[in-house]
Amino acid sequence: GQVVVFVEIGTDVCLSGINLNECVNSAVQKAYIENYYRKSVVKNSLFCRDNTNTNTPAILYTDFIEGSSVNIKLMVKGAGSENYSAVKMFNPSSSKSDIFEFIKQSLITAGEKSCPPYVLGIGAGGTMDYAALLSKKAFFNNTNTVEEKNFISEMKAYLSDFSSDILDIKLCSSSTHIACLPVALTINCHCTRHAKCSITQAGIVYERANNSFINLDDDSSLAQKCVFADDITAIRALNKGENILLSGEIYTARDAAHKRIVDDFAANGTLPFDMKDKIVFYAGPCPAALNEVIGPVGPTTSSRMDKFCEFMYSHGIVATIGKGERSKAAIDAISACGGKYL
């Protein structure tokens, strides 16, 4: 994911001889390269979508606080949840129910595509861009006012139909123009990856996560059928809802790779590989660490590949693997070709 960093600088602190932006980006680059994390940042959103291969530049916000410490708050945002975040400019006379309904409809749009259960960050106030910033800061806010706590409680009640899909709701509110009521929603997936530390003359104090996990007994309802990737008959015979353990050779490709495949075929009439009876995993693998065959691989939001389904399945793909629901057009294309979606 893309790294978002909030740096709070104490008024008694003097940062001399350093470029804070360069420091942050150097640290992000070092962390992503040395830990073999997946690098997800492209050079320019419109004109050069080549990977920087360093996961930089990070997004940096600075603020000033009282005291002699430097506080660093960091979050890592994946596109699966960020793509379904939203901002709406309400009329000042809008009710709480209007705001709650906006959040509800945004969650309906996100569906399963953003990896529920979710943590929601709500930002209210300022301008359009500031409300969005507040919705990010909300994830670090543990000092809500009584009014904010009541607002969150009422929102949770309004969203009761989503209770199993929401881990928590966080809120930051601020002043705004007399004629404005901007509200922003940032959706975080169940990982909601974030960290904090405070740097003082005495050293660095990290906020530690609670790592006391509960052991769960094996659930027999999750019994898996073993299927091999080259057993096309077994794959085509799979039924909706079956849990399988898939073994064998598969391909990984996300939207950028799909676009290249389609564009190359349109230009040259050839495919980069024989797609017949192949399986494509909608994922971007991380670099392999020493002694690893392949790095960690995480599924991406399948709906981004929906527009390629007809092409891919009609050219021989037998199954795709990803997360989240598919559009009706994608389902129809998969069914028409006798394919599967895992």
Locate each region found by the language model.
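Conserved phosphate/anionic-ligand binding catalytic regions in large, soluble enzymes, centered on
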Residues: G1-C14, S114-A131, S173-C191, N243-I244, ...
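Alpha/propeptide regions of enzymes that mature by internal proteolysis
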Residues: G1-C48, Y84-A86, F90-P117, M128-I169
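Short, ordered loop/turn segments at secondary-structure junctions
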Residues: G10, A79, A124-T127, C172-S174, ...
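Short acidic, glycine/serine/threonine-rich loops at helix termini
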Residues: I18-N19, S85-V87, D129-K136, C180-V183, ...
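Domain-length cofactor-binding catalytic modules of enzymes
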Residues: N142-S220
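Feature captures the catalytic cores and cofactor-binding loops of soluble hydro-lyases/lyases
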Residues: T143-S163, T252-L342
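Short, structured beta-strand/loop micro-motifs enriched in basic residues and often containing a Trp
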Residues: S220-D230
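Short, well-ordered loop/turn sites that connect or cap secondary structure elements
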Residues: A237-L238, I244
